Amino acid sequence: FSVLNNADITFPSIKDENGKETQITHGNFINFLESSNREVRKNAFEAVYKTYGQYKNTMATTLSGTVKKDNFYARVKKYKSAREAALSNNSIPEEVYDNLIKTINKHLPLLHRYIDLRKKVLGLDEVHIYDLYTPLVKDSGMKVTYEEAKDYMLKGLAPLGEEYASILKEGLENRWVDIYENKGKRSGAYSSGTYGTNPYILMNWHDNVNNLF
């Protein structure tokens, strides 16, 4: 799925808030969903999931294969279920998982109340998934470049000591970080390393406060 999602799938273009044709990518999809223009949010959401729908047979087969693989490994390793096997990697009892689900279900009314409040604040008759990400208050519009973010980070983490700050600065200035989104690049943000090398960070930076945090 990861290869299909990051390398093979291409999303269409839609008009942004300014009427400019912009191609949707994994990296900028959230920006469309945060738009104050509901039509932009709706168009972006439908464009992305219509694209995924074109690969539904491939995805269904991939999911089926993953389920069969998980069940096979659980069986040969003498686990009662694939769930028990998956949780065992982190030494988590199944009771903890069950309690988590039970607690979430118990407090669903609070989530429903939040959705009702969101509907009221946004002035909507009905809330759709693409309405869940747009801010309830006006964005400050503050833009933060990657270079500015580096300065904020170095200053903010200075209390951790000179050695920490020195290693952080070395990584930021010596290509330990793959910053910007690119075609075929994995979506999201990750850090990984191998024995004998410095760690590497993969991200898809956008000039906003959320990315700074």
Predicted segment positions?
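Catalytic zinc-binding patch centered on the HExxH motif and its immediate surroundings
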Residues: 142-143, 177-197
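Extended non-transmembrane interhelical loops and adjacent amphipathic helices
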Residues: 22-27, 149, 182-187, 191
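Active-site-adjacent bridging/hinge elements
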Residues: 75, 79-80, 84, 127-129, ...
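A glycine-rich phosphate-binding loop feature that marks nucleotide/adenosyl-phosphate handling sites
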Residues: 14-20, 72, 118-136, 170-181
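Short pre-active-site segment immediately N-terminal to the catalytic Zn-binding motif
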Residues: 140-148, 152, 159, 196-213
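His/Asp/Glu-rich acidic catalytic environments and adjacent acidic regulatory segments
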Residues: 1-95, 99, 103-106, 151-172
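Extended, well-ordered alpha-helical scaffold/bundle regions in very large, multi-domain proteins
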Residues: 107-113
